[in-house]
A protein has these predicted regions:
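Hydrophobic "anchor" residues on beta-strands that sit immediately upstream
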Residues: 61, 95, 125, 184, ...
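Conserved ATPase-coupling elements of RecA-like P-loop NTPase cores
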Residues: 106-107, 135-142, 251-255
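Arginine/glycine-rich "motif VI" loop of SF2 helicases in the C-terminal RecA-like domain
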Residues: 115-123, 147-151, 269
Length: 322
C-alpha cells in the first residue's frame, strides 16, 4: 500500500493512501535514511509504503519504505548541531512568510532560508504579511525589500491576511500562485501563517495566537507539520500547503564553507569574475564580489548574511540593513 505523509505528530504519522483512506502509522524499527542523520526520518510530503498492523482492526499501519525524494528542505535540529531536521519533502516551492514589524523578520533569517532552499534546489516565493500595519517609512522599506529580492529572482507578494483589501495583492491572487503546486509554508513565529492559511482555505480554522507584548515575538500555534488541500475551482489543478511550526532560527546544515557563496545567487554569479577560484570574498585581491559591494551592486544586508553563514554565526546576532 502506498500513500503520502500528510501529518507528523511526533511518533505517529498520518498517511493518505492513493484511494483517500487515512492510516495512523509508526516507523518500522530503527528505520533510517542512508546518508542523513536526522531527528525525523519521515517528513510530511514523503511518499511511503505501509503495511496494515494486523493486531489492530482500525486503519493503523507501519511505514516500511520511503520512496526516493525529489527534494527536501533541512535545517539543524534544535540543540543537536550534528543532527538535522527535515522540514518537508517533495515540494514544488517554498513560501517564506516575513513581516517587517510585529514581529520583525531579520534579513539574515530570510537569507539563510533562501540559501538553504537554493542548496536543495527548492524555488522560493516571499510573502510579506501585515502590510496594512506599515507606516509611510515602513512602506518605503517594503519597496526596498521588493526591489532587492525580486532583483535576484525571488517573487514577492504583499498581503494582509486579516484585512484582505489592504494588501498589495489579494489573498485570492496569492491562492492562484499556490494552485497546482505543493508549497512549504515557513517563517518566524508570529508572522501570521495560520491566519493566512485560514484565509486561503475557508473553513480550515487553524488555531492562531497573539504576539507576545513583552518581546514582540510570536508564540507557536502549529506544533507539528501538516499538509492541507487548497480549494479547487473549475479547471484548476489541486494545490497543497505544508504548514510547519514557526521557526525562531534557521541554522543551515552540512554546508561547506567554500560552498556558501554558491547559494547566494548574485554572489555566485559575480564570483565568476574573481581573480582566484577559491576566493572567499572577504579580503582577496581582485575579488569581484567586494568590488560589486563597494559599487552597491550587491546589497550590504546580503553580504552580511553571507558572512554570518561563512562564520557559522547565529542569525539573531545579525540585523543587516538593506
Amino acid at each position: 500500500m502506498q500513500g503520502i505523509v500528510i501529518k507528523n505528530t511526533g511518533s505517529w504519522y498520518v498517511v493518505r493512501l492513493d484511494d483517500g483512506r487515512l492510516f495512523q502509522c509508526k516507523v518500522k524499527g530503527n528505520f533510517r535514511l542512508k546518508g542523513i542523520r536526522s531527528t525525523n526520518p519521515v517528513a510530511v510530503g514523503d511518499i511511503v509504503r505501509i503495511v496494515p498492523t494486523e493486531a489492530n482492526a482500525g486503519q493503523v499501519g507501519m511505514i516500511t519504505e520511503i520512496l526516493d525524494r525529489r527534494n527536501y528542505i533541512i535545517r539543524k535540529a534544535s540543540n543537536l548541531s550534528k543532527q538535522s531536521h527535515i522540514i518537508a519533502a517533495n515540494v514544488d516551492q517554498a513560501a517564506l512568510m516575513v513581516t517587517l514589524r510585529h514581529p520583525e523578520t531579520s534579513t539574515t533569517f530570510i537569507d539563510r532560508f533562501l540559501a538553504g532552499a537554493e542548496a536543495y534546489r527548492v524555488p522560493v516565493i516571499i510573502i510579506f504579511n501585515k502590510v496594512d500595519l506599515l507606516d509611510e517609512e515602513d512602506r518605503h522599506l517594503l519597496e526596498l525589500f521588493f526591489r532587492l529580492y525580486e532583483g535576484i529572482g525571488y517573487p514577492c507578494y504583499g498581503v494582509s491576511a486579516l484585512n484582505d483589501g489592504a494588501g498589495l495583492c489579494s489573498v485570492d491572487t496569492l491562492r492562484k500562485v499556490l494552485q497546482g503546486k505543493t508549497t512549504l509554508f515557513s517563517g518566524n513565529s508570529g508572522v501570521g501563517k495560520s491566519t493566512l492559511l485560514n484565509a486561503l482555505i475557508p473553513g480550515l480554522d487553524v488555531k492562531t495566537a497573539e504576539i507576545s507584548d513583552s518581546h514582540d515575538t510570536g508564540m507557536h500555534t502549529t506544533t507539528f507539520s501538516e499538509m492541507f488541500d487548497l480549494p479547487v475551482q473549475d479547471g484548476e489543478l489541486p494545490g497543497h500547503i505544508i504548514d510547519t511550526p514557526g521557526i525562531k532560527g534557521f541554522g543551515t546544515f552540512d554546508m561547506e564553507r567554500e560552498e556558501v557563496g554558491h547559494y547566494f545567487r548574485e554572489i555566485f554569479q559575480t564570483s565568476k569574475e574573481c581573480r582566484f577560484g577559491n576566493c572567499t570574498h572577504t579580503h582577496e585581491p581582485g575579488c569581484a564580489v567586494l568590488a560589486a559591494l563597494e559599487e552597491h551592486r550587491i546589497a550590504q544586508s546580503r553580504y552580511t548574511s553571507y558572512l554570518s553563514m561563512l562564520e557559522d554565526k547565529d542569525e539573531d546576532k545579525y540585523r543587516g540593513k538593506i
